[in-house]
Amino acid sequence: MKFENANVLITGGASGIGKIMGRMALEKGAKCFIIWDINQEGIDATKKELSKYGKVAGYVVDVSNNEVVNLAYKKTVEDCGNVDILINCAGVITSNKTFDQQTEAEIVRTININTIAPMFVTRAMLPDMLQRNCGHVCNITSAGGMLSNPRMSVYAASKWAAIGWSDSVRIELQNMKSKVHITTVAPYFISTGMFTGIKSPIIPILKPEYVAKRVIRAIERNTSFRGIPFGFHFIRFWQFILPTRIFDWFFGEVMGIYHAMDAFTGRK
């Protein structure tokens, strides 16, 4: 889908790759970059920084609260018009604890923001897109939703669920012959504050600009699924082909992925 003259709403758009994608959307001629974020200071700073590129609107929204989402969407449409492109980018990883040490609050927060929130936001906007028979929803998930990883079990579960939901909705729309498109993006670790302390000795940690460019390109091409880097498309193939102990040895010990969270600190 083209970004030119489109209203582009990005959850978590006040920082990280969300902010970068908003800038790129404006550079491609978007009518308005609409930020939904929990951080008012971040929204204000991003609006000031990106206003030279085009129109930027921002709203403080707890995307894990369905009532808040519906009210915010109504206000957004009143102020900015229909949303043409939705990018569900808000996400959280709470700690590097093993599952037995995870608190109820950490589990609930992770699932609410990473899994339930994009469902709430998409459900609020999808009916209008379907009525217009035009629109695009891009869900930023994670390679952690395809590859099991110790010390991030709840995060991995939240992203596995998000991938399954996102691609299932894609097929529903396909069966409806709708021109509304769904893109699921599953990037490896990104060098943002969210992943501070992550170690990856073999596979390079991704640069935010690199990821943002590939997400924008995937939306423009109506790509159904995009692993970043591309090699992650083949994870499930290798899981099917290799015995579990060989798969674990290669990805865990040789590639070092199973130890990536050992020194994780995250955003403070």
Task: Put a short name on every predicted segment.
Residues 40-41, 60-72, 104:
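The beta1-alpha1 cofactor-binding region of Rossmann-like NAD(H)/NADP(H)-dependent oxidoreductases
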Residues 1-34:
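Canonical Rossmann dinucleotide-binding motif of NAD(H)/NADP(H)-dependent dehydrogenases/reductases
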Residues 142:
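Residue(s) in the substrate-gating loop at a strand-loop-helix junction
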Residues 97-99, 103-108:
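Substrate-binding pocket helix/loop in short-chain dehydrogenase/reductase
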Residues 184, 200-236:
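C-terminal helical subdomain
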Residues 30-45:
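Conserved glycine-rich Rossmann-like NAD(P)H-binding loop of the short-chain dehydrogenase/reductase
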Residues 122, 158:
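Active-site helix of classical SDR
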